[in-house]
Amino acid sequence: MATLTDRTYLPPLEDCLTGRTVILSWRLVASALEDADLARLTSPALSTFLRDGFVHELLKHPARVFEPKDLKQEFETKTSSIQTVAPGVDTIKKDALWLADAVAINQVAALRIVLIEYQTRAHSHLVLPLSTQDVANIQEAAGVGDAHASSILSLLNPASAVDAETMWCDFETEARRRERILATYLSERRSFTAAVDALVTFLLHSAPGQHKDLDSLRRALLKDAFAFDEDLDVPDRSKLLTMAPTYMNLVEDCIARAQALPAKLGESFKTEAFELDWLRTAITEAVHSLSIAFQALDLDTPYFAPHELLSEWFELMNSSLFLESILGFEVVADLAMPARSLVSAICLKMLNIDRTIQFLHDFDYPDGEEPYLLSSQTLNKIHTAVTNAVNSGVAASLPVAFAWSLIVHQMHLGYQERAERRDLLVNQRAQAGFELEFQPSASTPNRRRRNSAGSIVSLEASPYDDFLREQRLDNDIAPVEQIAMLATSRGQVYQVMSEMALCLGTTHEAAFRPAVGARARLVFQDLLKRSAYLIPYQDEPVFSLLAILATGRQYWDVTDALSASSLNQVYTDMLDDETLFTQFTMQAINRFPYEFNPFSVLCRVLAAALITNKDKADVVTGWLWRTPTLTVDWNPAWDRSYELCFEDENTNSFRLTRDVDLFGSASPARPRHLAAEERFIIPEGTLGRFVTDVGRTARLEFEHSALALLGKRLEVKAAEEICDSGMAPLDVDEQAEAVAMLATVLRAESLKSTAKGGDPEAPLKFLKEASRLLPHNKDILTVISDTIDGLVEKELLELDGPQIAVLASCLQFLHAALAVCPGRVWAYMSRCALIAGDARPGRLSRITGSLDMYAERFDLLSSAVKLFAALIDSAACSAVQRRAGSTALVSVRSAVENPWLGTSEKILSRVALAIAQAALDVYESTTTWRFRSELDRSILVRDVVGLMHKLVVHAHTLSSHLTSTLSPAAAHIISSFLTPPPSASSLRFQPLLGTLLVALITPRATLYPGQSRILAERVTSVLAFCTSLLRAADFLGQTHIPLQTHLFQSACLLARLPAANAVYRAPVLELLRALVEVAGRAANGSGEPPSLLGYLGSHAARSFISLVEGIDKPFGRVEHAVVTWRFFAAVIRNRQQWMAGCLLTGRTPREALKGGGEQKIERKVGEGSVLAAAMERLREVKSLDVQEAVAVMDFVVSAQNYWPWTIFAVRKEKEVVDALRGYVRGLKAPGMVMKTDGAAAAAFQARIAAYVAETFAMQLYHMRQMRQAEKFAGELVADLDYFLREGVMVWGYNASLHGNFARNFAKRFPGVEVDDFKRTMWLPRELGKGYYYALEVAEQMLGFDAGWGGVKQSGFRKEMETANLNLSLVEAQVSLFHAWEYLLLELTLSLLPKKENAAFARQVLQVVEQCLEANQRSQPPENIFVVLGHARAGLALTLLQRLADANQLPRDVTHLLALVSSAIHAVENPFGANDLPYFRTLLKILFVVLRAAKQGTAKPGESNVAITQQVLTILDRVVARCFRALAALVHEQQQNATDGTTTAPEDLALITAILQACLSVPGIEQCQVQVLNIMAAHDVFQVAVALFSWADRLLPANPSPASSSTSTSATNPASGDPVYGELALLFLLELSALPALAEHLACDGLLGHLAAARLAGYMRRTNVGPFAENAGAARCYAIWAKCLLPLLLNILAALGSTVAPEVAWVLNQFPNLLQSSVERIEPPGFSRPTLSLASTPPRQKFISLLEISEIHSLALLTRVLAACRAQNARDVPEVTWDGAKVLECVEYWLRGRKVLRERLVPLGPREVEWRGMVATGGVVGVAGDGGEGCENRLEEKAVGLLVGVREVLEGGLEGEGE
């Protein structure tokens, strides 16, 4: 067998000191085993730990854990320098050696404890008392001047608070560190035995089949550690029995340690607090050891324990007086009862009274069993221990003494019986010998050997005879009888057992787990069973037995949770065990209702406990339906109604001679005084018997319904009628018990009816049976309501404790009835005086208004709050059922049986509001009431805060009207906390604050799990409520500053809660996340939000971050890790700069400032930072859980977004980058993932890929700024396969799934739509089954219908889950698209400019095609897909532009052009308000592609023809059609702009640009006739001319500031902006580029129309120019220079001299413009100003490119016209334009290039861009110009035009000269 190593138990020192491995302390193991769901138990770390063989040895030999063995050599090996080089190891070694010597343990164990303290130092710091700064914040939050805050502030102890810095310095000292080490040592000792105790309970008593991993772990541990077989059926008893003596020895050691402190421990450490902790630790260890020993003994049932074990045990009990030697201190009072209970249980278990009595009756026990009765020595020790304890008055010994007296009594009887038989036999032998003397001697030889049977030898003395003789009990049993009398006098033993049963029960007062308690109570039950033959049926044993069964359980403890059958044995034995059933159960039945409580309590307890055992539960309810006997006080009125019978038997039997009415006269006629009710008649002939000698109590053999009888008696009690009855009226206690029993049984029936195979009608039948004897206008619910009304209306002073108990029981009954007849309960609550009504205040506050909250008042208040919560739940969950009405709803219940029919929504809303008001009253009073214990306060705060939380959640989870009835109540709660009056702000917050303080000051306990659970539930309820309030305020847009301020002030408490209990970690982080998010959004635009780190303080913040950055190590629960990472991301995103810096750098601001220096930036990411932890996880991103991976990536991406330096920090971690690249490189197609792992896995995969893309994009962006991106971008290209496949095509949406689901849902649930379950955004949505539709709400609302679950779970629940998963996938794919878009844009900027990246260019073009193809597919109508389509189009446009800029577009664009065209044609309403932006984007894409087509195709044949045909189609279906439509819309817009359609001048400009691009495509010039026909078919020419003619009255929908509104802007272009005139001429200008079209324009009289237009008149004005003061004049100049002159040129070029006269005539229509063009070109100082009407006023001489273009066009026109005039001077008029002067000016500008550069002004954004671009070198200075090369593109273009003007003019002048 391999040697066991402790590597798992104590990991290597290096890993522990660096934090790579967290030691699994026994405290962590114990806390994990305390979890209700045992979720942490299946974590890999803990599972490995528990399966470790070394740990198994420790479990079986607990003394080895802290044994004082010298392991110095092993210690040195573990701490040697070769094992670790981490700093601080010397201190660790010194502390370990000190601890080992101080408390006498081995060095290795001490080392483990010191390392645990080292790793939990942040916990230790956070659980220190609050600093003065923290106390000040808490006082401010509580309201220092508020009298109600005194109870809360008293918990702070402000006088002892010290400064945070002083506290930290003290915390770092050696003395404090060693105090913490000692505390850790004691904690580990307590936790070890607690962990073993919990583990043994889990192994032996957990119900199998609940969780596969748990079952596997349980089997492995039972097999490996305790030698069970594979089926867990045949355990090795020897292994089990060794645990009992082992842990009993540990108890002995605990007793010794409890009586003395460590001898070598320094005196400075022996403080009062340490002494108390030492004592409590020893006792706690003893209690858990006792529990382990008891469970081991219990598993050995029913065998005798070895007599050696009994001998040792009772010797220990004798020496310690049943542990009273260490339990007699007040400071350990809470530990005393658990210890005493287990001591008694173990003693009784060892005495084994059942088997002992059987043994004393000659029971044959199996071979190998050693009864302790065979050892007189053991018996003597038992007797001595019991006698001494009883004589010393030890209460724990009384049950043992009682059992021992029964055993010794039986021994004495056996001894006396054998003695009498021996004496009788001796006498018989003596007489026989005397007679033989007279017989003849001759017969002697013939005598045979006699049979020895019955001889004295056969009556041997029993082994215990020696014990009896030694103790002188052989003849005198009086000493033992004295012991029994001491035990039973005044019912002491029964009282003790009742108290122990409470400690061993299942309520919050129980000290142990239910399994241990149930088995221990079974031992006490056995004792009562065995004593039943000696002690008659009487109050003490009966009520002790009921206490053992009930253990304090009340109505609210009823549950249908499954439990192991062995745990229910204490209940089932009341039915199955013959003795118990005969002596107790049947006695209680037969004495009912004369003795009321035993039977009622028995039914109540058994009905509640046996819910999951249907057969047994039916037996109990059967007693109530068919009670066999009726025991009553005989009414004298019945004296003539019976006759005696069976007189010879002297049994006092009788027979009724007439019918007897139990609630009326007994006359033969049986008058029907109430004809409308069924009467309780005992028929004639019924047999009975008088059962008492004194009094006349009779038991009638009359089977009846106890339910109906109870209902009648409650009615009589409620009405306070005086009835001639055979039974006395119920007293108040009986009334309370009766109602409680009915409520409990009804609740049990309701729970059973919902279980598989249950009867849905059973609860209703129960109510009907209880109402059977009532008048027909009443039922049991009416009786309960009348009872409440009668009690509530009484004055406060008249209500005593029992009456309040009745009221509480009635509220419990209403709660039980709520599940059966909710409409009735709501109707009653609307008129119940407990809560406020329309014109009355609620009386609940009056009844509970006293400061002293004694038991009955507390029960009433708790019951009321729980009832209110159930009412709110029922209102929320029944929303669909109430709307079903009387329609034929196919469900579990038919429409006729709908319990909500007739319920008014108004009533529900009004009652809910009253409940909210009552809840607030109770909530505010919880700080002032004096409770019996803080536990009661915790229960009430938990319930009332939970009620308010439910209201907020129910009202805001859904976006529909389904929960609108709760909206007023929720609004009342929210407004009370968010916008309270100034005086009530702190008052509202005090109970919440008190909860946080109580959670911090309450120490962790390994006992009383119920109390720990209640406190945890209280705290988590408060935290969840605060979170919901913040979320609701943010969602509703309400102010939340008061609550936000209080929470920030309480941040020091919130940060400490996870250190107090790990259960609080997740809810605290959720609250802090909501707090920083809401505060960050509220502070937008109004300054910085409050600083979380500022309120925490630097030291507390550092400890808090250290605590939570462990991300639930070592358990690694995914849900906790996700919550933690989301909190970190929220801090990063919401302007918590200081806290964010601490997360990212691992240093507080103070530490960062101390670092300083030049290396500050390089050292920002510390080893212990959260960012470093994130990158550590991302190194293993492939193996990381997908949910945690999403959360980690979200944090990293947020850090890079808000803190750019982190981008370089991530980039430096090459392993992280490589891991992310490898992750996306290995991703499978979502379709494959869905088939293998489901839609959720595909969604998370896509979301992670999106985050990875964002990360790479941000890295590329910042690297590009440093010109380092090209290499990384090139590497990434190889990893883009997943993005290229899935980045654009959001194919996940399953339209048929959602359509069919919505249709089927509406058909199944009339009046309700599936969208009614759409989740609001008040809580962040999470990918998964509950993403879009609130599945948990639907489960509550629709669970009543059979179709919701469906056959084999295939109903609407499954469909909703599938729909949510599908929408999760869509959401993830949309995120993937946007991230891919971001990454792709960065890649194109880095790679496209390089020609060698042609392969990447093809990939980019592939993405463009994917975008266009995706948009042409059928899209769902949801807005998200509309937005997505627009985004795809935008991405395609950007990519095409970048491809074009890089000259990377393909030469053959046929396919691309076809895609764009089909995408454009697919737009149904291109100029609709929703589609117009998208249509514009497509037009821009078309323009870019057409520009690429202008370069020609690779093959001049077929492809050219195809492109030409496509271009012609575009001209027809896009250009001409859109131009006409836009022109019409412009006119309509001007008249009526209410149709929602808004066009812009840019649209016409875009169409013109497309026209230009189309006409530029090679080969289109050969299709002029087709183009002309297309344009003519759409009347484009006329439309353009009309648009120009109306331009002065058509203004753009969104005018620029320069052309903004004046009253005359619609008719005066001098003040408006006639932009449409320019656009119309530009469109005609592009058409005129084709000669055929230019000729058509001229023939249609275009020039005449232009000259005659109103706009032409404005163009003739003198203020027209490029630098005009208003937009109209500037636009007129643009029309002249950019449109009219080029248009005239095109027409002149097309028609030549034919049109020259008309062109010249048009030019002469604008003499001012002709003259001003010459003046504008003049250089500064070129000529003196002249007084001329046509001249422009003097101005600062600047020149623009448009002005140069103007003279260039005029130069060409005038020269061509001059040539025509030379041939035909008569027809062609002269155009007056000073060309010579212009030439002179041009020469000047060309020679003075510096002046030109200074005076050249850009007019538009494009020219501004040219000015910033370097010149291409295409135009340089000409020799003789005296100038140099151009510096920018704008200058270059201007020089080119000037050179062109010079060439034209010089040529013209030379010709003239010639």
Swiss-Prot record:
One of its GO terms (molecular function) is structural constituent of nuclear pore. GO terms for cellular component: nuclear membrane; nuclear pore inner ring. Disulfide bonds: none annotated. It comes from Chaetomium thermophilum (strain DSM 1495 / CBS 144.50 / IMI 039719). It comes from the Eukaryota. It is a peripheral membrane protein. Component of the nuclear pore complex (NPC). NPC constitutes the exclusive means of nucleocytoplasmic transport. NPCs allow the passive diffusion of ions and small molecules and the active, nuclear transport receptor-mediated bidirectional transport of macromolecules such as proteins, RNAs, ribonucleoparticles (RNPs), and ribosomal subunits across the nuclear envelope. Due to its 8-fold rotational symmetry, all subunits are present with 8 copies or multiples thereof. Part of a tetrameric NUP188-NUP170-NIC96-NUP53 module. Belongs to the Nup188 family. GO terms for biological process: mRNA transport; protein import into nucleus; RNA export from nucleus. It is found in: Nucleus, Nuclear pore complex; Nucleus membrane. Functions as a component of the nuclear pore complex (NPC). NPC components, collectively referred to as nucleoporins (NUPs), can play the role of both NPC structural components and of docking or interaction partners for transiently associated nuclear transport factors. NUP188 probably plays an important role in NPC assembly and organization. Gene3D superfamilies: 1.25.10.70. The keyword Lyase does not apply. It holds the Pfam family Nup188_SH3-like. Keywords: Membrane, mRNA transport, Nuclear pore complex, Nucleus, Protein transport, Translocation, Transport. This is Nucleoporin NUP188.
